[in-house]
From Swiss-Prot:
Substrate binds at N79, R80, D122, S160, D171, Q174, H202. It is an enzyme of class 3 (hydrolase). InterPro entries: Calcineurin-like_PHP_ApaH, LpxH-like, Metallo-depent_PP-like, UDP-diacylglucosamine_Hdrlase. This is UDP-2,3-diacylglucosamine hydrolase. It is found in: Cell inner membrane. The gene is lpxH. Keywords: Cell inner membrane, Cell membrane, Hydrolase, Lipid A biosynthesis, Lipid biosynthesis, Lipid metabolism, Manganese, Membrane, Metal-binding. It holds the Pfam family Metallophos. It is a peripheral membrane protein. It comes from Xanthomonas campestris pv. campestris (strain B100). Belongs to the LpxH family.
Length: 247
């Protein structure tokens, strides 16, 4: 049996081929597995469960179909879809996990994260994250009319793209540092939780890293994004493997 991990699909009506790839993945590769974990950024943006979206409806229907076959589906919010709430979770048949979460994965304690908490060198983003994860902020935002939420999301996305462009045009080494995990934070996280494996997404740099932390040999698995292809981590009792899914 196998447990599947994915993240950073960034599903968007502007990229229907990726949505179709995901729906095909749910139909053909998830049934019969032990569980499916979605570690954030399933959607490019999410401004409330009440937002009309035929694509989100199709995704919810497909996820619910998987869950009804007996495969547990878990969702951890990312930096793009942290406002996914209980109403959508019920429709999709998944359980929302806090970030981070420790699970027992075939006898090995494993820390699951979206991954943005490890990017502590990006101090501006960490401040934004702290603000937007505040329950009072979220309640106030979700109480606004849909049009106001759409406008805010568009402004936030434009600001994010502008900042990314500014960073890319600057020092390349600085860009790589700011947009990737901070090694010191990775080490501290391994020590804090006292375990030897972390699985996360967010950085779009799929890889399996072997690091030393707290005097132990540890594994950090980074999930891939779904822009030019799909990406899935398969874990069973014998090991793990990152795989690409062709469009």
């Amino acid at each position: 049996m196998t447990t599947l991990f994915i993240s950073d699909l960034h599903l968007d009506p502007a990229r229907p081929a990726i949505t179709e790839l995901f729906l095909d993945f749910l139909r053909t590769q998830v049934p019969g597995s032990d569980a499916l974990y979605i570690l954030g950024d399933l959607f490019e943006a999410w401004i409330g469960d009440d937002t009309p979206s035929t694509a989100a409806d199709a995704v919810a229907e497909a996820l619910h179909a998987v869950a009804t076959t007996g495969v547990p589906v878990f969702f951890m919010p990312g930096n793009r879809d942290f406002l996914v709430g209980a109403a959508y979770a019920q429709r999709a048949g998944f359980r929302i996990l806090p970030d981070p979460t420790v699970i027992d994965l075939y006898g090995q304690p494993t820390l699951l994260m979206h991954g943005d908490l490890l990017c502590t060198d990006d101090t501006a983003y960490q401040a934004f994250r702290a603000q937007t994860r505040d329950p009072a902020f979220q309640a106030q935002f979700l109480s606004q009319p849909l049009a106001a939420r759409v406008a805010f999301a568009q402004q936030a996305r434009a600001a994010s793209h502008a900042r990314q462009s500014e960073l890319k045009q600057g020092d390349q080494a600085q860009f790589e540092t700011v947009t990737d995990v901070a090694p010191a934070e990775v080490d501290a996280t391994f020590v804090r939780y006292g375990l030897d494996r972390i699985i996360h997404g967010h950085t779009h740099r799929p890889a399996i890293h072997i690091v030393q932390a707290g005097g132990r040999t540890c594994t950090r698995v980074v999930l891939g994004d779904w822009y030019e292809q799909g990406s899935v981590l398969r874990v069973d009792a014998d090991g793990l493997a990152l795989e690409q899914l062709a469009l």
